[in-house]
């Protein structure tokens, strides 16, 4: 799941002296480097039209060094791409786990199951690292309890709300081959498909 707001969180120090130009140049350089990392990261994320995004991922049965390396790679991609979550299928790995960020901590959840949802639901725009700039309104519960295993195969449970609750529901959808276009209203789906249609010409078969 993409984090649209992070793209706009650039602050600048203001100084009437020579320091202002130096600080401004550093900010511009950092922003440029961040954009390069984002483009490189997104080039490694499977995009709309790739058949792997429609597959239901297989349960994780082996928790080993290979899984740990995948988690590390996916976490780096998630941050570089300015995302708040990334599912294994989005990098072409048909295994049932995703990475996400919660309270400043990088986490992984394998074989996840939502065991409880709150009564309140909210419609909000969602983006996806596999769908470019497309954002569509999606209705989801605002609170969830989700259980699964960490990278070591240990049982874990998280009680989540707000953006993080939305993010884990989004990533769990990915593991079932479901995209945000499937969750939105017909008019928004039609508009999104019109934007995504050119990507189908470039998608692997």
List where the protein language model places each region.
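Positively charged
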Residues: 1-205
């Amino acid at each position: 799941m993409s984090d649209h707001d992070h793209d706009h969180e650039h602050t600048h120090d203001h100084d009437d002296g020579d320091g202002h130009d130096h600080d401004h140049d550093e900010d511009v350089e950092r922003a440029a480097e961040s954009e390069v990392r984002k483009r490189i990261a997104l080039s490694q994320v499977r995009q709309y039209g790739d058949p792997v995004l429609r597959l239901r991922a297989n349960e994780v049965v082996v928790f080993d060094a290979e899984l740990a390396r995948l988690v590390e790679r996916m976490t780096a991609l998630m941050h570089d791409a300015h995302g708040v979550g990334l599912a294994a299928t989005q990098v072409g790995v048909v295994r049932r786990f995703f990475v996400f960020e919660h309270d400043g901590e990088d986490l992984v959840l394998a074989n996840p199951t939502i065991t409880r949802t709150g009564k309140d639901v909210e419609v909000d725009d969602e983006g996806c690292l596999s769908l470019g700039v497309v954002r569509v309104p999606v209705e989801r519960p605002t609170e969830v309890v989700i259980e699964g295993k960490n990278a070591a195969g240990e049982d874990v449970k998280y009680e989540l709300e707000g953006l993080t609750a939305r993010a884990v529901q989004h990533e769990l959808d990915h593991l079932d081959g479901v995209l945000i276009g499937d969750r939105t209203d017909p008019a928004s789906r039609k508009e999104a498909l019109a934007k995504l249609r050119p990507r189908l010409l470039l998608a692997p078969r």
